[in-house]
Amino acid sequence: MPLTLRELTADELPASWALGRMAFGGPAEAPARALRVVPGMTRLGAFDERGTLVGKVVDVAHEQWWGGRRVVAADVSGVAVRPETRGGGVARQLLTELLVRARERGAAVSALYPTVSAVYRSLGWEVAGSLGATELDTAALPRTRAVDGLTVRPGEPDELPLVTELYERVARQRQGLLTRRGGHFDEAPDTPLPEGVDALSLVFDGDLLVGALVFGRGTGYGVESKLDVHHLLATTPDAARALVGVLAGWTTVTRAVRVPLLAGDVFSTVLPLERASAGSATAWMHRPVDVVRAVADRGWPAHVTGRVSFRLRDDVAPWNAGDWELEVADGAATLRRAATEPDLWLDVRGFAVLYCAATGGRALGQTGLAGGSGDPAALDLLACGPRAELLDYF
């Protein structure tokens, strides 16, 4: 089917919402945020010969933290295709166009949450992690009080920028987390608190915010009642213990609390995780938009030095394909065209998994995403550093 691919106009956003609602469900009336033009966000549409919108995709234009540096991302959301045209390659054309446009605007990497992973695998994305949360019985939480020098108090809506600054102190040395700056993050909310948030509890050390609990109360106070924590942040063990004590104070009216955690973060050393009653995990996928930028723009472990050459396969983004040499030194890295033919090869999906430190070279070789006559353990250089994580759904 011949398609016209272009950016949607403001007048076409209601039709875009209707298409998304058909795919994912939702209210008949679009929320105001869905009908606004957001700076930096690119909404692409596919139109048939009659001018009917038959598919759409959104480039959310985030930035991700990688080793203390901001990396421009083309994170993907809202992929939807009309049922009459599904299976006809509409999504493939839209996502290929998104990658071309994203590279032109300077994007280096891309993440998404798949509904059907096979579609995205065929286009070079691969599962590299999961967005998770842990559910705990509030009665199992230690009732810890704040130590001298810390102040625990309710937060106000106008203090949310302080929470963002605290998040940045936590997130910037990790891999893959959104910066939560720019685009829709800078938009004024329609309500004093974000959707689903009822209150904040803050911990101060003097004038410095060192801990924040942002949560939704939920409904009821019986056995099914649950506190839904949106953000749980701290930069010191004492601040973490103080916030866990606040959560424990909900024992009489909420039987469970659902908390997002980062691997090895300060709350992981304070909470009784062995008492977790349930959890959830939503897979996310990653891919390079431009491999040269993806390597050069991020921070790398300062103690790692090395080189490895490989042939990269990328049929969808041909500018990434070819023979490359990766060199890492002094907390930085470069990717240059290899002078000689490499003895290792790497599929772009394998590049994504290694880049996110989700596996090593030899294990990747068992998946068929890497190979060659050389030892695939040499590809561990691309995977050096902490594993990538996400805390935001989009």
Predicted regions located by residue number:
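Short amphipathic alpha-helix that is part of the acyltransferase structural core
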Residues: 1-61, 66-75, 141-184, 226-227
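Intrinsically disordered, low-complexity, positively biased terminal segments
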Residues: 2, 9, 149-394
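GNAT/GCN5-related N-acetyltransferase fold signature
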Residues: 46, 59, 81, 203, ...
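Conserved acetyl-CoA-binding loop-helix of GNAT-fold acetyltransferases
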Residues: 78-81, 87-103, 237-248
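Conserved active-site alpha-helix within GNAT-family acetyltransferase domains
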Residues: 103-108, 114-132, 264-280
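Aromatic-anchored glycine-rich loop motif in surface-exposed flexible loops
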Residues: 129-130, 136-144
